[in-house]
Amino acid sequence: MKARELKELRSSNPQDLTVKLGDLKAELFNLRFQLATGQLENPMRIREVKKSIAQIKTILREDEMRALEQ
């Protein structure tokens, strides 16, 4: 993800992030299935999706910690 996209994610609400996280997990499942069957055209997409999942989880956790501090 680009820095601009990360800023947009940080400004969005947790419900939107949770939906996006679910979509990315489903995409990762499909990519892994394609990899196993030999139909995957772009193996780097798996890495990109995993990184995006980690970034969204980090943003959600930061929001949780910020809420606990208040």
From Swiss-Prot:
- Any idea which GO molecular function terms this record carries? structural constituent of ribosome
Tell me which Gene3D superfamilies the record gives.
1.10.287.310
Q: Would the keyword DNA-binding be found if you checked this record's keyword annotation?
A: no
InterPro entries, A to Z: Ribosomal_protein_uL29, Ribosomal_uL29, Ribosomal_uL29_CS, Ribosomal_uL29_sf
Q: Does the keyword Lipid metabolism apply?
A: no
Keyword line: Ribonucleoprotein, Ribosomal protein
- Name its GO BP terms in alphabetical order: translation
Looking at the UniProt entry, the stretches that span the membrane are none
GO CC terms in record: cytosolic large ribosomal subunit
Q: Name one Pfam family in it.
A: Ribosomal_L29
Q: Which domain of life is it from?
A: Bacteria
Family named by the database record: Belongs to the universal ribosomal protein uL29 family.
Tell me which NCBIfam families the record gives. Answer: L29
Q: What is this protein called?
A: Large ribosomal subunit protein uL29
Provenance organism: Clostridium botulinum (strain Alaska E43 / Type E3)
